[in-house]
Swiss-Prot record:
Pfam families: Response_reg (PF00072). Transmembrane segments: none annotated. This is Chemotaxis protein CheY. The lineage of its organism: Bacteria, Pseudomonadati, Pseudomonadota, Gammaproteobacteria, Enterobacterales. It comes from Yersinia enterocolitica. It is found in: Cytoplasm. Its cofactor is Mg(2+). Mg(2+) binds at D12, D13, D57, N59.
């Protein structure tokens, strides 16, 4: 079972979606959740440190989720952060692109709390969290 004090950053340009993900994480016992509205905002927050997990949308202005993922993976300090992509992009090529860029997991919107929990648990298990 993962540490319930893990610090999550939820990245999505749609505030309602950020709130939904935040509330689902709270239902799962994770209360340490912050939000960012795009990849640029997310990177600024991530670089201040202290985050344990990123949940990111794909389609966002300024810097999309795939570019955010690639930037995180290329950053020495952030490179090992687990990143779960939560997106409406259900095409096989998108899922492959995210996997090749180093996504820890992929959830297609809309999704349930059970789906989110299952994906998180797989990532926690794989990373020994």
């Amino acid at each position: 079972m993962a540490d319930k004090n893990l610090r999550f950053l939820v990245v999505d340009d749609f505030s309602t979606m950020r709130r939904i993900v935040r509330n689902l994480l709270k239902e799962l016992g994770f209360n340490n959740v912050e939000e960012a509205e795009d990849g640029v905002d997310a990177l600024n927050k991530l670089r201040t440190g202290g985050f344990d997990f990123v949940v990111s949308d794909w389609n966002m202005p300024n810097m999309d989720g795939l570019d955010l993922l690639k930037t995180i993976r290329a950053d020495g300090a952030l490179g090992t952060l687990p990143v779960l992509m939560v997106t409406a992009e259900a095409k096989k090529e998108n899922i492959i692109a995210a996997a090749q860029a180093g996504a820890s997991g992929y959830v297609v919107k809309p999704f349930t709390a059970a789906t989110l929990e299952e994906k998180l648990n797989k990532i926690f298990e794989k990373l020994g969290m």
